[in-house]
Amino acid sequence: MSYGRPPPDVEGMTSLKVDNLTYRTSPDTLRRVFEKYGRVGDVYIPRDRYTKESRGFAFVRFHDKRDAEDAMDAMDGAVLDGRELRVQMARYGRPPDSHHSRRGPPPRRYGSSGYGRRSRSPRRRRRSRSRSRSRSRSRSRSRYSRSKSRSRTRSRSRSTSKSRSARRSKSKSSSVSRSRSRSRSRSRSRSPPPTSKRESNSRSRSKSPPKSPEEEGAVSS
């Protein structure tokens, strides 16, 4: 368990990955906790190269697979040093120590999210972030263009409806005026022309009966 020694022979062992550890949790503490469920072969806590502090996760090796499964079921969600542990089966083997990796090939990088998962390079993260940003921008642009097109279609439909209503009102007013003019012309044609006073007097005189000779003599005397 000392960090200066090379890793032991872990072939045939079952490894558990323990996440969400505090910086003060030691390998001895983990061994005491996990030995309740079976024989522990190895406990390894990766540390930072420069600060030498714990990276917040560890690997616990069991000689028997059934003991490892029992420990995983019991310790997943348990609280240790004020932290709720997350325990799962490790996917790959334990990485070698830093001093031992100088002689051999460079070790694989193991992230804190899952054992055996390679940490993504910052370039890939930047690319993924830029892609997500471009996607969000394109989505926002498409939504903005859709709202613009909808507002345009609405304004067009409103203007067309207004023009149609104006045309209808104009046609109605013109038809009403035409009907009024027609009725006036008909009433004028039906009414007889007015007669003057002279014509009426002459007609009344012509209609009066002729006077007798006796009436004429009396008038002359």
Curated annotation (Swiss-Prot):
UniProt entry tagged with the keyword Hydrolase: no
Keyword annotations: mRNA processing, mRNA splicing, Nucleus, Phosphoprotein, RNA-binding
SUPFAM superfamilies in the cross-refs: RNA-binding domain, RBD (SSF54928)
Domain RRM: 14-92
Biased composition (Basic residues): 117-171, 179-189
GO molecular function: pre-mRNA binding; RNA binding
Family: Belongs to the splicing factor SR family.
The protein's name: Serine/arginine-rich splicing factor 2
Organism from which the protein derives: Gallus gallus
